[in-house]
Design a protein with these regions (language model features):
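Short gly/ser-rich loop at a beta-strand->alpha-helix junction or flexible surface loop bordering the NTP-binding
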Residues: 1-151, 275-298
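Surface segments flanking catalytic/ligand-binding clefts of nucleic-acid enzymes
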Residues: 133-298
Length: 298
C-alpha cells in the first residue's frame, strides 16, 4: 500500500515521548484527558494524578489551570521537576489524602479542590468549592484541607460559603460577585408554580424584591433539549416559562458569560431593582483581591 496517498493530519500534538495525537480537538480538557491516558501506563504505585489533572478526573472545574502538562504527585521523594509534558511534585512520605477513582490513583476530592482553590481567585475558588460539595465532599473536610499555607484565606472564605445547590461554575461566579459587591444574598434553585401547576426552578431569587436572576449559556440550553427538539424549541419553552413567572409579578435579570466577565455588569443589573444599599458580607481582604494570589514573603 502506498502510504504517501494517505491524508496527513493537519496538526500533531506530542502527548509524551514517542506518542502523538493527530488532529487534536480544540477543547483543551479533552486534550488533557488524552494526555492522562498516555501517562497512566507510566505511573507506578507511588504516583498519583494531582491538581488540574485530578480535578478533571473528579469532575471539578479547572478554569485557567495549566492543562498543557499532566500533573503528577510522587510519594517518597523530595524534588519535583517540570518537562514539556508533565509537572511532577514530590512529597517525602505518603499523605493520607490520596485515593482511587475508577482504579486511577489521584489526590482526594477535598485535597484536589484545595490545591486548585489556593491557586486562583475567590470567584473560581467558590465555583470549585461548590462543585466539590455537589460531588459529595464534606465541608469540614474541605475546610481542613484549605487551612494554612498559600491562598488559605480566600480559599477558606470560599469553603465556608460554598453551596451544593449551585449547578454550574458560572452560577458560582455570579454568586461570588454578589458577595464581593455587597448585594443581598438570593435563594438558590427556588421553585415557582401557578394555577396550572409547576413552572420551573430559577438560579437566583430575591423574595423581598420579587427579583429572579438567571445565567444564560448555550450549554445550559442544549442540556434541556428533549429528543427531536431544536434549540429554538427550548428557547420558546423558556420564554413561555418566563412569561408565566412574570404573571406572578416577578422581574427578571439575565446574564451571559460576557456579563460575568465584565466588571460591574452584574451589580448594575441587580441594583436597578434593589437600590444602592451595600451589605458587608464579612469577606476577608484576599477575597476582594482580583489578582492571582502570590506566595507571602517569609
Amino acid at each position: 500500500m502506498d502510504n504517501t496517498a494517505l491524508p496527513k493530519p493537519l496538526a500533531r500534538l506530542r502527548l509524551r515521548r514517542g506518542q502523538y495525537l493527530d488532529d487534536p480537538p480544540a477543547d483543551q480538557e479533552l486534550v488533557h484527558i488524552k494526555r492522562l491516558e498516555a501517562a497512566l501506563p507510566q505511573l507506578d504505585e507511588t504516583s498519583y494524578f494531582a491538581r488540574a489533572s485530578a480535578a478533571l478526573i473528579h469532575g471539578l472545574p479547572v478554569f485557567a489551570a495549566d492543562l498543557d502538562r499532566v500533573h503528577v504527585l510522587h510519594t517518597g521523594g523530595s524534588n519535583g521537576r517540570i518537562s514539556a509534558v508533565t509537572h511532577e511534585y514530590k512529597t517525602p512520605k505518603e499523605p493520607p489524602n490520596l485515593t482511587l477513582v475508577d482504579g486511577v490513583r489521584v489526590t482526594t476530592l477535598a485535597r484536589t479542590a484545595s490545591d486548585m482553590m489556593r491557586r486562583t481567585l475567590f470567584g473560581p475558588s467558590l465555583a470549585i468549592a461548590d462543585a466539590a460539595l455537589r460531588l459529595g465532599c464534606e465541608r469540614a473536610e474541605l475546610l481542613a484541607e484549605v487551612k494554612g499555607g498559600r491562598g488559605c484565606r480566600h480559599a477558606t472564605e470560599a469553603a465556608k460559603r460554598a453551596d451544593a445547590l449551585s449547578e454550574s461554575p458560572y452560577e458560582s461566579l455570579v454568586r461570588a460577585t454578589i458577595l464581593q459587591r455587597g448585594l443581598p444574598l438570593p435563594l438558590l434553585q427556588h421553585e415557582f408554580s401557578d394555577a396550572w401547576g409547576f413552572i420551573g426552578r430559577v438560579d437566583f431569587y430575591w423574595p423581598r424584591f420579587r427579583l429572579v436572576g438567571e445565567f444564560d449559556g448555550r450549554v445550559k440550553y442544549t442540556s434541556l433539549l428533549a429528543p427531536g427538539e431544536t434549540l429554538e424549541d427550548v428557547l420558546h419553552r423558556q420564554q413561555v416559562r418566563q412569561e408565566r413567572m412574570e404573571a406572578l409579578n416577578l422581574s427578571f435579570v439575565r446574564w451571559d458569560a460576557d456579563a460575568v466577565h465584565t466588571p460591574g455588569a452584574i451589580e448594575a443589573s441587580v441594583r436597578r431593582y434593589i437600590g444602592d444599599g451595600v451589605i458587608d458580607h464579612g469577606l476577608c481582604p484576599e477575597a476582594h483581591d482580583y489578582r492571582r494570589p502570590r506566595r507571602r514573603a517569609a
